[in-house]
Amino acid sequence: MTYSVKEIFLTLQGEGGQAGKAAVFCRFSGCNLWSGREQDRAKAVCTFCDTDFVGTDGENGGKFATAEDLAAAVEAQWTGGPDDRLVVCTGGEPFLQLDDAAIAALHARGFQIAVETNGTITAPAGVDWICVSPKADAPVVQTSGQELKLVFPQEKAMPERFAALDFERFYLQPMDGPDRDANTQLAVAYCLSHPQWRLSVQTHKYLGLP
């Protein structure tokens, strides 16, 4: 298949259980919960997305004809040695495109594969780290993984709805925007009274990283 990628870049993971680790981010174009166009936001399933995943015009983005081409583009951004290679496949919704061939090609180049998904599509075999970020009106079919990261608060997606799922770690991430400070205080209070949940702060935004 041809892979449509918005951007590929090296940074530090800013969120969740792998925060602070060097990683190549591979942002796939397209999502099944929103078109990515502002005129469609009000009727989208996910209305608070803060990411541009439309098209292939971002840094090192493009259309890649084969899984090998995609893996080579990811590897080209890695500046470390052969060990501890990490690629974070995100979007949009990466499982619309990330397939067995791409997983095999990335593994062949020594990358651990982490994925940030909305959880509406079952993960293919071989993904090393699954982070599910549920959205209020979307079903969660990927019910296990390394972490569940819930943007908080969402009126129709409160933490107790997901607390019994089979994840190793549970994170609340304050919703960004004009109410971020208030949302952060709400998340802190919830974590204090529900210790199963940990606070995830978008540290890359505070540090000015992509």
UniProtKB/Swiss-Prot annotation:
Reaction catalysed by this enzyme: 6-carboxy-5,6,7,8-tetrahydropterin + H(+) = 7-carboxy-7-deazaguanine + NH4(+)
Protein name per its UniProtKB record: 7-carboxy-7-deazaguanine synthase
CDD domains for this protein: Radical_SAM
Family: Belongs to the radical SAM superfamily. 7-carboxy-7-deazaguanine synthase family.
Cofactor binding, per record: Binds 1 [4Fe-4S] cluster. The cluster is coordinated with 3 cysteines and an exchangeable S-adenosyl-L-methionine.
Binding residue positions for [4Fe-4S] cluster: C31, C46, C49
BP-aspect Gene Ontology terms: queuosine biosynthetic process
Function noted in UniProt: Catalyzes the complex heterocyclic radical-mediated conversion of 6-carboxy-5,6,7,8-tetrahydropterin (CPH4) to 7-carboxy-7-deazaguanine (CDG), a step common to the biosynthetic pathways of all 7-deazapurine-containing compounds.
Gene coding for it: queE
UniProt entry keywords in alphabetical sequence: 4Fe-4S, Iron, Iron-sulfur, Lyase, Magnesium, Metal-binding, Queuosine biosynthesis, S-adenosyl-L-methionine
Cofactor: [4Fe-4S] cluster; S-adenosyl-L-methionine; Mg(2+)
